[in-house]
Amino acid sequence: YESDPGTPIMKGGRVAVVGGGNVAMDAARTALRLGAEKVYIVYRRSLEELPARREEVEHAMEEGIEFKLLNNPIEILGYQNPDDRRDPKNGFVTGMKCIRMELGEPDEKGRRRPVPVPGSEFTLDVDTVVIAIGTSPNPLIKSTTKGLEVNRKGGIVVEEATGATSREGVYAGGDAVTGAATVISAMGAGKAAAAAIDEYIKGKEA
């Protein structure tokens, strides 16, 4: 661990985190710790539909994060100086346009589908937007690694006990295998894969 890794961190003053899962809660709370003056969580469903763990939501609320529920972003607004293409402010976020939602009929998973409310658009005054609406494995992994089997969601298929993939000598674990899960789960998969890799190398050297 390095206290100063040398990589600058852009700190937002007013931050919008889009999403309602554990990663969204982590991102919002981290933004506060980095010095943001205001942090919003923007989620298109209601509090009851938030997929994040209850304790994560409660901690975020206790820390002063404002929840913009039943709202959905439709456009990220940015600064553009028409007279100076080299203006260093060009491309910086100036706000996020949203629309209010209401819950309609249930979808195929039984969750009530959010429906836009016509004419309810508004602009949220933010200078930073963090998108935290889900995770999926990078499709480049499969296309650049011959012989690697993936499931229909793009997750790498492995032997559960060892992390061994369909390609000899290649091991995988964490979200690239299971989809969005916890750091603890990924660490466990990493330890199992490390032990299996050690045995694999020893077998090659014998």
Question: Each predicted region: which residue ranges?
Answer:
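FAD-site-proximal beta/loop scaffold in flavoenzymes
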Residues: 1-12, 106-180
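Rossmann-like NAD(P)H-binding beta-loop-alpha module
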Residues: 2-36
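A structured beta-alpha segment of the ubiquitous adenosine-cofactor-binding alpha/beta core
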Residues: 5-6, 70-74, 79, 87-127
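Cofactor-binding loop segments of dinucleotide-utilizing enzymes, especially the Rossmann-like FAD-
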Residues: 20, 43-46, 175
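A conserved FAD-binding loop/helix module that cradles the flavin
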Residues: 27, 176-204
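Rossmann-like dinucleotide-binding cores of NAD(P)H-dependent redox enzymes
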Residues: 28-75
